[in-house]
């Protein structure tokens, strides 16, 4: 059952190698929002294995899950946010993440790129529809560690860039990150671009960070400049980013070539939120 301890930031865990980075990100966001952290270990069971058979091996699964969730609790202790843990056995992979987010009334979900692709042993027919109707904010980290020393946030505005800004603010205020904003414009639009970025930064509580306005191709510019940062936070420019992630397409080719860690941010559209409230289409 959902708790009443403020907004819930759910972190979906499936790999011990990425647990620390995901909890560090989710913990910073939970503290920033004055909410709680929900660590969920989703154990994806192959289709050929029944859930009953998997449950019969529960002792082994419980040990593995207990170790992973204990590590999550330890890492979460660094943040001023209460933490809860859960383990779920499922054939449905990514669908289970959406169900858990809805069941627990999550305000945001943090997961790894590899975890976002755990589709179980079958093709998930409703995947596109599922990923285009997000139940809450989604953050997908491509990288096994989170170094929040220097963070770059490219922006052209929009709801998902608003989420990127909130994450950057959380990492700055909670984890001590140094944040830079990047806005890429066409030739001859540098002045208007700087005016836009200055106003955008002020409106998102980031008026004191480094502002960069570049005139070039957007993807190539993010690739070139992003290499100098520890983390690049990229907001979705259209609905369905998560659908592409699950199918193995991280983002643009330029983003995929980045050696640094990338955090993909997608915020539900107003239409999706309205549909959640009225329960229809």
Give the label of every model feature segment.
Residues 117-118, 186-191, 240-242:
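Short, small-residue-enriched loops and turns at beta-alpha junctions
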Residues 77-109, 119-122, 204-242, 246-249, ...:
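Structural beta-alpha unit
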């Amino acid at each position: 059952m959902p708790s009443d301890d403020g907004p819930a930031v759910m972190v979906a865990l499936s790999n011990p190698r990425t647990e620390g980075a995901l909890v560090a990100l989710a913990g910073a966001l939970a503290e920033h929002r004055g909410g709680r952290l929900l660590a969920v270990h989703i154990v994806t069971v192959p289709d050929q294995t029944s859930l009953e058979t998997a449950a019969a091996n529960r002792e082994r699964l419980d040990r593995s899950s207990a170790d992973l969730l204990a590590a999550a609790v330890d890492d979460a202790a660094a943040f001023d946010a209460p933490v809860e843990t859960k383990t779920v056995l499922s054939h449905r992979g990514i669908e289970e993440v959406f169900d858990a987010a809805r069941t627990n009334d999550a305000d945001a979900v943090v997961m790894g790129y590899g975890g976002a692709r755990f589709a179980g042993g079958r093709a998930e027919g409703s995947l596109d529809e599922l990923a285009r109707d997000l139940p809450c904010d989604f953050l997908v980290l491509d990288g096994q560690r989170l170094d929040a020393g220097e963070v770059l946030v490219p922006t052209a505005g929009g709801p998902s860039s608003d989420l990127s800004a909130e994450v950057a603010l959380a990492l700055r205020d909670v984890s001590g990150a140094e944040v830079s904003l990047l806005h890429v414009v066409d030739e001859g639009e540098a002045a208007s671009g700087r005016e836009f970025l200055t106003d955008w930064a002020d409106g998102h509580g980031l008026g004191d960070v480094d502002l960069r306005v570049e005139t070039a191709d957007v993807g190539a510019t993010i690739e070139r400049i992003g290499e100098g940062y520890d983390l690049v936070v990229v907001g979705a420019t259209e609905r369905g980013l998560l659908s592409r992630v699950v199918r193995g397409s991280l983002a643009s080719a330029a983003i995929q070539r980045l050696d640094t860690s990338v955090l993909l941010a997608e915020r539900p559209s107003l239409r999706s939120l309205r549909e959640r409230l009225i329960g229809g289409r």
